[in-house]
């Protein structure tokens, strides 16, 4: 494990927190849609998309911390997930949104999250 500057350590902790928050947000959106929807669902989903964009802005710093091919591939995969998220707004039906969440967005995000956490945990777990 490499030594990190305080700012780098803080960045990884915040990044890990955001990863968990996004998971919770996706779970909330899926539940709300399955339960008949909520006026807040589009707002929460937009917040998830905004969080993805915020995370994407930190990826250059993350890549510098973990100067490894595996992490670079995960960061590229993250960029592709943003495309799945944007497809949400193209779906006209609740059924289409549920299908998109269950078959593409949530599974790909959760798999990505587990892989990224393998890099993060040595630095963020005490």
Predicted feature locations:
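Short, solvent-exposed, charged loop/turn and helix-capping segments
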Residues: 51-72, 119
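Mid-chain, well-packed structural core segment of small domains
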Residues: 63-88
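A structural signal for long alpha-helical coiled-coils and helix-turn connectors
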Residues: 30-37, 63, 86-90, 120
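Short terminal alpha-helical segments
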Residues: 1-46
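Amphipathic, well-ordered alpha-helical segments in soluble domains
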Residues: 18-25, 51-58, 77-84, 108
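Short, charged, amphipathic alpha-helical segments
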Residues: 42-47, 72, 76, 97-106
């Amino acid at each position: 494990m490499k030594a990190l500057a305080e700012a780098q350590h803080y960045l990884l902790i915040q990044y890990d927190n955001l990863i968990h928050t996004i998971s919770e947000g996706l779970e909330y959106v899926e539940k709300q849609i399955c339960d008949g929807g909520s006026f807040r669902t589009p707002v929460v989903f937009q917040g998830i998309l905004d969080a993805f964009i915020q995370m994407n802005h930190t990826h250059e710093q993350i890549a510098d911390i973990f100067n490894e091919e595996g992490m670079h591939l995960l960061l590229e995969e993250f960029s592709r997930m943003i495309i799945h998220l944007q497809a949400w707004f193209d779906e006209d039906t609740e059924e289409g949104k549920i299908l998109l969440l269950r078959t593409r967005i949530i599974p790909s995000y959760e798999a990505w999250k587990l892989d990224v956490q393998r890099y993060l945990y040595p630095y963020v777990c005490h």
